[in-house]
């Protein structure tokens, strides 16, 4: 069975095709119930989509396990299918089979229609340049949490020997002969740029060395996939990654690491609602920075082999000073859900966002719901970051505890959207959360999970 939009049964087909209808795109949330029970998180969105792209580099079939049924998987499946990859997905088993033996160029208009709201298309560059000698990458979507330029990506591709031609609607790339290994230092340890380099270097001629690389667990898992395919990659402790290019790669069989962002989101929901949630598929090693912070705020957790239990022990939560950072720091994607829980902590919490310059826009709606949050341009509470001199509102001071009340809110971005669900669950009264199809991008069956945890929610 080919992965078609119909396979993503609980998802709207419209958003998959970049055609939001707005129908039934809201959730009513009757707040006040502590979340309680057990849920499962499957593979990490920010790994699964990249591993799917990596399959393009192999000459044989790949099998990826623990794949969640989320819209980003649907978007990448669509793009791979357009390029001649046979994609078969069983949502129940979470297994995706990818056969790239008949890869071909796709029509520009179709690529555009399937790119949806994702940023993953930019990672098709290296694999397509190796397979076809050219690529067309549509203008990217993704969450509006900063400018999110792709200058590092384009610089990497140019240095490998690709001709990069910006056109209306996207970028056309052409390989001028076989791509050749490079030595490069990233200005910032960008996740996407590191992945771009990995997916390009593995089949380039000679050695590539990247300094100041990102080393997020999802990247390490991608390196494991590439090693299974036949790549030679070493990761040093000082953020240096070395790749020896090889002529051929095969397919892989791999089980995706769990989604630590989804796990932390549910943990924050447990804390904000005074609940007790066990998350199967959450792993300590990838969440250590989150677990430390969760404990400092006053939440409790218990790590088991297959799950982590998170709960609010009763009594007041504590305010904290927090700075987001690249791995092994506190992830930016954990920030938004946790901020909702911090509205319930006693005293002043300070959160300094150092990864994205505009990731506090979501706090407007929280203020509407009764939270006391002020946003500042200065780097508060930590070392100065690269946004300090640039006039961005990237520090927040949260004063609590403040009771939250119901409101009518519109999802601004993926993690901000989940944060609104948490706020609505913690609030008194019935909230309306609009634009929830955006949450489908990264949270598998979130309504079913909410219901399983005792939340009183219904679709509009
Ligand atoms: C990935 O985005 C994730 N997305 C993001 O998750 C995550 O927040 C981010 O990494 C950081 O962990 C996916 O994996 C699909 P970056 P990415 O390149 O790769 C700047 C979520 O909610 N930068 O590490 O796009 C950039 O502007 C999403 O799941 C450049 O300046 O992030 C940002 O400030 C949101 N030029 C910083 O680097 C470039 O060419 C980090 O971005 C590239 C990045």
Predicted regions and their residues:
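Short, structured segments at the rim of ligand-binding sites
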Residues: 2-460
């Amino acid at each position: 069975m080919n992965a078609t939009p119909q396979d993503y049964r609980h998802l709207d087909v419209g958003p998959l095709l970049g055609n939001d209808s707005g129908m039934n795109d809201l959730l009513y949330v009757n707040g006040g119930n502590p979340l309680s029970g057990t849920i499962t998180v499957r593979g990490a969105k920010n790994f699964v989509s990249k591993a799917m792209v990596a399959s393009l580099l192999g000459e044989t079939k790949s099998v990826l396990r623990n794949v969640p049924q989320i819209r980003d998987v649907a978007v990448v499946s669509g793009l791979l299918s357009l390029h001649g990859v046979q994609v078969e997905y069983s949502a129940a088993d979470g297994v995706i089979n990818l056969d790239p033996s008949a890869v071909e160029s796709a029509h520009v208009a179709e690529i555009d229609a399937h790119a949806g709201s994702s940023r993953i298309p930019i990672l098709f560059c290296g694999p397509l340049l190796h397979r076809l000698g050219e690529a067309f990458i549509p203008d990217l979507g993704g969450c509006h949490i900063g400018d999110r330029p792709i200058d590092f990506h384009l610089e990497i591709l140019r240095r490998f020997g690709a001709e990069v031609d910006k056109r209306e609607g996207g970028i056309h790339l052409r390989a001028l002969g076989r791509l050749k290994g490079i030595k490069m230092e990233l200005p910032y340890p960008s996740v996407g740029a590191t992945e771009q380099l990995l997916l390009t270097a593995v089949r380039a001629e000679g050695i590539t060395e990247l300094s100041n690389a990102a080393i997020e667990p999802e990247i390490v898992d991608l390196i494991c996939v590439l090693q299974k395919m036949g790549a030679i990659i070493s990761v040093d402790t000082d953020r240096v990654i070395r790749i020896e290019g090889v002529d051929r790669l095969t397919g892989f069989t791999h089980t995706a690491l769990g989604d630590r962002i989804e796990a932390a989101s549910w943990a924050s929901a447990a804390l904000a609602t005074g609940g007790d949630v066990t998350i199967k598929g959450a792993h300590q090693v990838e969440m250590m920075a989150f677990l430390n912070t969760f404990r400092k705020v006053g939440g409790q957790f218990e790590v088991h082999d297959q799950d982590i239990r998170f709960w609010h022990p009763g009594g007041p939560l504590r305010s904290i000073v927090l700075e987001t950072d690249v791995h092994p720091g506190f992830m930016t994607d954990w920030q938004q859900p946790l901020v909702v829980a911090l509205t319930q902590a006693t005293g002043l919490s300070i959160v300094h966002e150092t990864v994205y310059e505009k990731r506090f826009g979501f706090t407007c709606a929280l203020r509407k719901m009764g939270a006391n949050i002020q946003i500042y341009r200065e780097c508060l509470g930590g070392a100065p970051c690269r946004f300090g001199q640039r006039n961005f509102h990237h520090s927040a001071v949260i004063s609590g505890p403040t009771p939250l009340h119901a409101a009518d809110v519109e999802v601004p971005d993926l993690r901000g959207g989940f944060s609104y669900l948490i706020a609505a669950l913690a609030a008194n009264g019935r909230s309306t959360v609009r634009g929830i199809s955006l949450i489908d991008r990264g949270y598998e069956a979130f309504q079913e999970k909410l219901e399983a945890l005792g939340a009183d929610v219904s679709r509009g």
